[in-house]
Amino acid sequence: VTLTLYLVRHAPTLPNAERRYPLLEEDAPLSPEGREVAGRLRLPLQAAAYTSPKLRARETAKLAGFPHTFTVAALTEADFGLMAGHTWAELEARFGARPREWIEALGHPEGETGPPEGETGRQFHARIQNWLAALPGEGEVVAFTHAGPLLAALRLCVGLRAAEVALGGVVVLKRAQGQWWLRELRLPHG
């Protein structure tokens, strides 16, 4: 009894090109480049497909060949609080070293803090853990999501603390007998 989980980071958007943290209410569409990247994704089309409610994830799914998906709020990006709408350089200029501390706390499953006015590490990881626990016991699942939930799943499933997954990148995990394995990290086809 095996589950194969394909975690897909949505394809590029204009805010991604600007390298700023997304606003919680922001719902940016894919950029022209993002539409091309999404159209080149190769995923098992018979798999059950889940998507974040955000347009960028839903468009990635549709262009990858998944017109019918289950929308799951748990797959939404982390709530970055007052970091949202700003670039890393802007945050460092305004807050010094504190943004690094906020992101490290958000990236820790037991983190009691996170970005001010945003999620704590514990809240964020609990949201992802609850979604992972609700997945079927076998078959194939494709989830179109964001960097934060994808990285949280890697931390929770295989203990990977640091990774960089490109926009349009895919992480393949396998679960058998209650144990997760990392099977593959795919770069977007270019």
Please give the residue ranges for each predicted region.
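Active-site-proximal alpha-helix that buttresses catalytic centers in soluble enzyme cores
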Residues: 2-70
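Generic beta-sheet signal
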Residues: 5-6, 47, 137-149
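Short, active-site-adjacent cap segments at secondary-structure transitions
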Residues: 14, 56-58, 77-78, 149-151
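Short hydrophobic/aromatic-enriched beta-strand-loop microsegments
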Residues: 29, 67-74, 160-169
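Short beta-strand scaffold positions
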Residues: 51-52, 126, 144-145
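Phosphate-handling substructures
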Residues: 64-127
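Domain-level recognition of soluble alpha/beta enzyme cores
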Residues: 159-184
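Acidic, His/Gly-rich catalytic cores of divalent-metal-dependent hydrolytic chemistry
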Residues: 186-190
